[in-house]
Amino acid sequence: MSKKSNKKLHIICLAAFAVLLCAAIWLLGRVCQPKYMSGVLEGAMTQEYYNEENPHDVIFVGDCEVYENFSPVTMWEEHGITSYIRGSAQQLIWQSYYLLEEVFERESPKVVVYNVQSMKYDTPQSEAYNRMTLDGMPLSKHKLDAIKASMTEDEDMVSYLIPFLRYHSRWSELTDEDFEYAFRRDPVTIAGYLMRADVEPMTKLPTAPVLDDYTIGDTCWEYLDKMQKLCDANGATLVLIKSPSLWPHWYDPVSYTHLTLPTSDLV
């Protein structure tokens, strides 16, 4: 065999090995990545949206205060409004923005509803919550931008793109669920609404804490402005809400001057 043939065979073998290695890493990542099919279901919510086939009149974005407080089924049955909730646990405003960018690539909702609670956070907060929102997004510029904006100091971009690098330590903890749902997921929501059967009445209103700073951070204002411009560019009306909740505390209207968010902007 000539040297030229040997070199060609060597290149083919290296290419085949690289392909097999990449396939193995991808497969192991699918197996080791958390499935969120039991226990904490919130991590499975983001990717459900991509199975939607019909457009929606209204899109909700935000944290648990949207996916636990609004029912798309009720909105349809009582008002004939089609809607979907693109919510996730502790969804930060920049994550809401990039999820909304995805929405406008797929459909043209008339109204976007954003719950402002997460504007209390002006910096990345938690890798665990980041993962529950971002891991379900398909690879795209929107996902890359969302990861970059969301990473805490101890995180890196590569581990989001190659899940096995982050989740390989789960190998000894794998259960039947990890293999059963390696390539599929069961729905955990109804149009993004996470139905709960363990709701309890309020028995005590928490004491409102005294905050060191009542202002909303510049990053939050920046992304709220970008969200408004994105909606305007796509012919959608942006509605800001704050859902009723025990926490964070509802401060008296006279205190809103400290929050720097005009009461006229709240629904």
Tell what function each PLM region has.
Residues 1-8:
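N-terminal Lys/Arg-rich, disordered targeting/topogenic segments
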Residues 55-69:
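Catalytic nucleophile-elbow at a beta strand-turn-alpha helix junction centered on a G-D-S/GDSL motif
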Residues 257-263:
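Conserved small/polar residues in nucleotide/adenosyl-binding loops
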